[in-house]
């Protein structure tokens, strides 16, 4: 189970989500947790902005505790706005500020409706296909164990989000990184609470890489079968003509 400070963080993030408005599209691990059933703890908020205006802080001023927050800007540029909110949370290691990251890199794709999102309970959230695509790209391009865990979750719960090339790329990354090494890193992060699961059952994540590869193999075969059925030539039915012969 999560600690009290983590539960408070989850509640605060939900409150903030209902203040940000329609210009910001929710994405990332926390979006997966809140709206698509991910069972691990995620502590940050990530958004894509539709317009050039990436100032989300104005939207947060209506929060009942805003006057008690300390806000620290980490980065402001044409394509990024990163800041933290110190709302008084503490962990055994010290202060526990909330990180918020807004990106403007996808605004043209969003305006052209090339990235699908929906409004769920008043919050604009990327569709699962888009989040899965982003998570796949993250897993392939960086070495964070949470991406490894999330890919396994997505393959299990949302297999429709992956085509054959996606499956090949993920399998290649696991083989390149080493299945045993990935398993050890995942178990270590769970044991040291760097990666928090709702049910901390080490047995469930043992051989996690092998489970992913087995699932990939099954999904790949299913896609192959579907492709064969789709492209199977249709036989024209013979019919009898007026003279009793076989028509063409």
Regions found by a protein language model. Give the residues of each.
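Structured mid-to-C-terminal alpha-helical surface segments
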Residues: 1-24, 37-40, 49-52, 56-248
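Acidic Asp/Glu-based divalent-cation binding sites
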Residues: 46
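Periplasmic plug
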Residues: 43
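Glycine-rich beta-strand-to-loop/alpha-helix junction loops that act as flexible
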Residues: 26-31
């Amino acid at each position: 189970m999560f600690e009290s400070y983590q539960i408070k963080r989850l509640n605060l993030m939900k409150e903030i989500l209902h203040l940000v408005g329609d210009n910001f599209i929710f994405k990332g691990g926390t979006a997966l947790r809140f709206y698509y059933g991910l069972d691990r703890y995620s502590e940050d908020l990530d958004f894509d902005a539709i317009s050039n205006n990436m100032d989300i802080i104005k939207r947060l001023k209506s929060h009942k505790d805003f006057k008690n927050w300390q806000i620290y800007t980490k980065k402001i540029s044409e394509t990024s706005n990163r800041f933290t909110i110190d709302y008084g949370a503490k962990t055994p290691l010290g202060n526990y500020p909330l990180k918020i990251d807004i990106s403007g890199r996808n605004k043209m794709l969003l305006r052209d409706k090339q990235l699908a999102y929906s409004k769920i309970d008043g919050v604009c959230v990327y569709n699962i296909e888009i989040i899965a695509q982003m998570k796949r790209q993250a897993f392939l391009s960086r070495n964070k164990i949470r991406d490894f865990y999330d890919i396994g979750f997505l393959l299990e719960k949302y297999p429709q989000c992956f085509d054959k090339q996606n499956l090949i790329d993920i399998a290649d990354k696991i083989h390149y990184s080493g299945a045993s090494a990935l398993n050890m890193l995942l178990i270590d992060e769970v044991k040291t609470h760097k990666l928090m699961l709702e049910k901390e059952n080490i047995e469930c994540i043992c051989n996690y890489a092998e489970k992913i590869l087995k699932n990939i193999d099954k999904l790949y075969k299913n896609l192959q079968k579907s492709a064969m059925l789709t492209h199977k030539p249709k036989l024209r039915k013979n019919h009898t003509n007026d003279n009793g012969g076989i028509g063409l």
